Amino acid sequence: MESGGVETTRQGKTESLQYAVGPMAYVYARSNLTIDPEEWGLLCAKSSDQPSTAVAPLIPGLTVEEAFNTSIAAIIATKSSGMVGGAASAILSPCHFSPSVYVFYGGERINATSLAPGLTALCDEARTKFGFSSPPPGGPVSNAKETSGETICAALDMDPETTMLYLVVAEPFCEAVYMCNTFLHFGGADSVYINSEFVRRVPIYPVQMYMPDIALRLCRNPFDTNSRNIGEGCAYPKPLYNKSLNRVLHGAVLAPQGQSLRTRDLEAVARAATAVAFDGNFEGCVLAADKTFTQPATPQAKSAAQKPQADVERRAACSLAADLALTTRVSVSCAPYKFEGNASAPYCQWPMFCDAKTPDERAAALSKFMAELAGIVGAGFFAVNSPLYASEVVDGGAAADPGDKHASSNLTRFFFACGLHTLGCPTVDYAGNRVSDGTGDCALASASGFEYGPEHLAYACGFSPELTARALFYLERCSRYQLGADCRGGANTLKFVAAETTMAAECRWCTETTRQYCVRHTLHRLRSRLPTPRAPRRGPMAVFGAVDAEYTDCDQLGNFAPYSHMKRAGEGDSARNVMNDTYRGLCGRVMQFLVSEGLVRADTGEDARNIQSAKDLCDTYDRISNMVDEECAKFIAALSGARGYHYKEHLASSAHTFAVSLNPYSTSFCPMLSHLVTQTKSIILQDLILSQVPSTFDKGQPETKMFRSAAMPTLRSAFMGMLDKGFVSGRQEPVVVSASSVTAPDTSVPSTEKSVAQYEYSLTRGQVLKLKEFKVKNRIVFNGFEGRRGGVRMQGMADSFSRPASVKHINILGGPLGFLLKRYHEMIFGPENNVFQFWNKVIGGTMPMSHLTPEIRKTLNYIRRVSKAYAESNYVKAQPQTILELANFMVTNKILEYCGHGGTNGSFYISTPSAAVMSATRNKDPSAELAWLPAVANPTTKNLTEAAEKSIASEPEKNWVSTSMVTNACRLVMGTKPIIGLGIMVSKYIGQQSSTTVFQAGNWSGFMGASGIQSVNAGLSGDTTRKCMLACKRTGALIKAGPSSSFTESSLAGQVRSMVEAGCTPHAIYAVALRVLGEGLRDVTTDTWVAIVEDRFLIEALEELHAQIAASTPNGWTHEAAMAELNKHGNEEVATDGEMLNFDCDDDDADKDAPHGAKSDVPNGDDEDVFAGPSAKKRTLATEILFC
């Protein structure tokens, strides 16, 4: 039977969505001999010490049939008519299926996700250490009787030796399965085909179907066959309880919820969630009695009267947010979602497999994509502001006027903070009485001495060995950064492993034979990137999700001149003509021109043409410049004419905008990613809830037990009023069912027999909460006046956005032609010097005139002239890296010129979007190779190094690691429907027309890392003018393409950036890196170079230099050999014979070829244009000056 639902599209139209009425869950039974162990291992989460269980993704064509319905109206109970002899009716609840499936039997053929040993013991220890409850050994209810996997196989007449069983369950009822409130209806078992494989499946229904005369609620004694609640004439079945299944659900479902809700009693979470799932009308508090709180750092008073009021209110806020978040999650899980667009392609049709001919090639393609994804997931573990660590609610202080419950300070009073250092602290109940002593003193006010350990990783993964193994899978594919105090020999993981193995160091989780893969070694390798909690203060929160929308405003000027603000010229003016006159239409014409000229690839935006000569370079730039001038003139004329758009006034309100999808199936292809996205939603929604808590304090006294129940209706109403108010897009949608009756098991017949009955039905929920997306924005134009009155933070932003009043330094290689000059240097100037040496000599005045032909001198003069002109009118702080970026930046600057930006805000750069796009590269780091290296006999440092280097040299097809490259063509990246990670600061403010309406804005912000933002990912920038996100493209991999110890400025990275701007050669930069990193430079990773220099061409030059030094010495790379090679290069004499080119002339038309030292009319004043780099009077630049 089918029933119709209602779904509202983004355009406001309503479309019908058909539901298949059916069971709330299935157990799928299939042969494990037909699965590909390697592919399943790359997709699933499986621990090596739990061979039969795993958490797998919900993927059509892999774990479920291609026609699988993700949204259903599930039968959750029956209800008596109340008349003697009357038939019972069914109760339906709309819901969608969980994005993960749970393998609980027969998973031995699936490869372990990580070879790390002892993850189950680690998770059990961490759970106990941090005070979370463990699965009861006898089951979650009394007298539980297990239904084993062998029993299920026997009932289906399948071989238990070769059968694999896994649970596919509706999202709201995962806890109901855990609480043994369901049963297997073997009589309703059917067959489906998954990728041409015959698979059996057994439907699961709730035991409440046999209890028609009681109110719909959690059944606390489901194994009591003599219960008076069982209906007359019912053949009561055996409830489903499987110990392995419950263990998997405890770690993958319950513990993550307990973590985000700050509730350590996970059995209480299961009971509460089950009760709310069955009772659609419940609006009270279900966790209040079981909630505990971290004890404050200040000593507790002996009596309740002496307890600080602020701490009572903090506990009230923590409890209310958790309760409302739980009921909201259940309500949202009842809303319909489906695979969007091309994302519904079955597994066998994923684009990444289109060129794969063999299973090995398929596994290699899958391994490569997962390595790309590691950059996103890794950020979830490296970021201090990750939702995985937001375990503490902090009170920032009440408003100055207690009576003003809508004061802005009240909206931001409570906020989340990283609580890793408080996990073992003592806990108190709501009254403030200690209930647990914890494992150490509370350090709520200080994180000094904190060290991230394996227990913290297990906590972030819900104490699930499966999810912990999956997390390690991604961390093993993240690069270490040799930047920081521990970058030298002590951080060498190979030595760390060898020393511990030979010394037979005791470890609770590994043995002598498995110590090579121990979790401690992965964390040791990445320890410079692991998070360290900071002093609690309100800041951005890390957000992870997917972009599903076709339309985003992520060009340099965002939603400037949008379609909605354009006037029509008349009735005959088509929508196409109007769109053509928008800023987006302008960007489209620019792109079309570049494609038609053969300069840019239409699908990726990358350069499609090689520069062949100096003349070609000049002609290409002139063509782009002329096109930009013409198109921008037409654009402005249209805006000020027929379109009636006041572009000067609207510039200040323009913003970059896009949306993060809340569809759970956008990220369902990876269990760890689903976990990260689910935690993101929970924390973000609770942040909104916390803003409304202070308004409930006038409903009663927070210290009383009844306060939370009394305040909940007010809080719920206030939270629902925040939907569709700028940040969270969602609404309550009605549930409409059109079927006349439904088919369900006949309760008078044993569940092992095939028998069904027709039931009339009713709905437990008349409407559901459908959340669609988080809206993110970033204002483009910075208002400098706010910086003068906004305190230290705003003043710092003003300093970052500040633009020099006049151009004194022209950075040739960082200017408009820099990327072309670096890429095609040999084609333009010849192979005599590499690009960095050449420009170092030209700018520094050490280039002999005899080495330059008249054509080269003419080209140099042209480059200087256009670079200077660009710099004088440039308001984009980023450097173009492609022809498309160059054209877009030129368009941006031209429009800003028309808008008068130079006159009104000419002293400030604009804010621009960028994306660190994830990619995969072959691993070069021997210490990372340990994770998948076969066990090494006699694991000394030498043997480990030789084995790792041999493995690297062989270039196995699956040993990929994550890397990234930054692009400023953000809208093109958004067009690939990427998985993204970024920081968001949610601002809340009161509406002008209503004092009770709270609007929000999801402001694009950044990550927070232990050693700066680059410890999260090397591609990120700490420059506040550049808003950067992490992005992993789905188009081309999962979705078919459409028709169209310090990272601060005083650190090594800051020093090298200064050298790059000064035009230093790769040898000089390499010398500085060698001084700082020492032996750590031996196995330097690409991501380390990215974090230092950001310039892809310079990175290639540095890696080539590193390889040359290693190849030039008989014993490979050593610190001494590297120093000797650099000294040899540094002693090369600069040519002094003949005249030198003077490239420091201000007059472009006079003295073009004046020799160095010749008399010039250029004044030697402060406003003289000099190029970034050494003075013409200095022949060399000593690296020692960087350490003065």
From Swiss-Prot:
Keyword terms: DNA replication, DNA-binding, Host nucleus
Motif (Required for filament formation): 838-839
Gene Ontology annotations of biological process type: DNA replication
Pfam families, per database record: Viral_DNA_bp
Stretches the record annotates as Required for nuclear localization: 1166-1188
Ranges where the record places region Disordered: 1145-1175
InterPro entries linked to this entry: DBP_sf, Viral_ssDBP_head, Viral_ssDNA-bd
Main localization (coarse): host cell
Keyword Cell cycle: no
Subcellular location: Host nucleus
GO cellular component, one term: host cell nucleus
MF terms (GO), sorted A to Z: single-stranded DNA binding
Subunit structure: Homooligomers. Forms double-helical filaments necessary for the formation of replication compartments within the host nucleus. Interacts with the origin-binding protein. Interacts with the helicase primase complex; this interaction stimulates primer synthesis activity of the helicase-primase complex. Interacts with the DNA polymerase. Interacts with the alkaline exonuclease; this interaction increases its nuclease processivity.
HAMAP family according to UniProt: HSV_DNBI (MF_04007)
Function description: Plays several crucial roles in viral infection. Participates in the opening of the viral DNA origin to initiate replication by interacting with the origin-binding protein. May disrupt loops, hairpins and other secondary structures present on ssDNA to reduce and eliminate pausing of viral DNA polymerase at specific sites during elongation. Promotes viral DNA recombination by performing strand-transfer, characterized by the ability to transfer a DNA strand from a linear duplex to a complementary single-stranded DNA circle. Can also catalyze the renaturation of complementary single strands.
Family listed: Belongs to the herpesviridae major DNA-binding protein family.
Protein name (record): Major DNA-binding protein
Species of origin: Psittacid herpesvirus 1 (isolate Amazon parrot/-/97-0001/1997) (PsHV-1)
